[in-house]
Amino acid sequence: MSEKTLTRMDLSEAVFREVGLSRNESAQLVETVLQHMSDALVRGETVKISSFGTFSVRDKTSRMGRNPKTGEEVPISPRRVLSFRPSHLMKDRVAERNAK
């Protein structure tokens, strides 16, 4: 497994090389796309990117949890969590890479 992490800079550099926009325009494009995705998720909307996956926000109810050190029961408050569900194509690509 690779230790490499894909960053915003990597994405904007790829747009610069492959699309032909200037470096500034490429960085601005990446930032704009990420901002639109973030804004939609904050509003509770689902972000679906075909052949990639779906980002969604789920509401979790309050429940009782347990402190692993003491075993004491502690209440866990309700919260919103972000989840990602990869598309079947993405799952297949990752599995194919693992098979090599």
Swiss-Prot record:
The keyword Transcription regulation applies. GO terms for biological process: DNA recombination; positive regulation of metabolic process; regulation of DNA-templated transcription; regulation of translation. Keywords: DNA recombination, DNA-binding, Transcription, Transcription regulation, Translation regulation. PROSITE patterns: HISTONE_LIKE. SMART domains: BHL. Changing R8C: In IR4; altered DNA-binding specificity. GO terms for cellular component: cytosol. GO terms for molecular function: DNA binding; structural constituent of chromatin. Pfam families: Bac_DNA_binding. SUPFAM superfamilies: IHF-like DNA-binding proteins. This protein is one of the two subunits of integration host factor, a specific DNA-binding protein that functions in genetic recombination as well as in transcriptional and translational control. Involved in hydrogenase gene expression. Belongs to the bacterial histone-like protein family. PANTHER family: DNA-BINDING PROTEIN HU (PTHR33175), INTEGRATION HOST FACTOR SUBUNIT ALPHA (PTHR33175:SF2). Heterodimer of an alpha and a beta chain. HAMAP family: IHF_alpha. This is Integration host factor subunit alpha. The lineage of its organism: Bacteria, Pseudomonadati, Pseudomonadota, Alphaproteobacteria, Rhodobacterales.
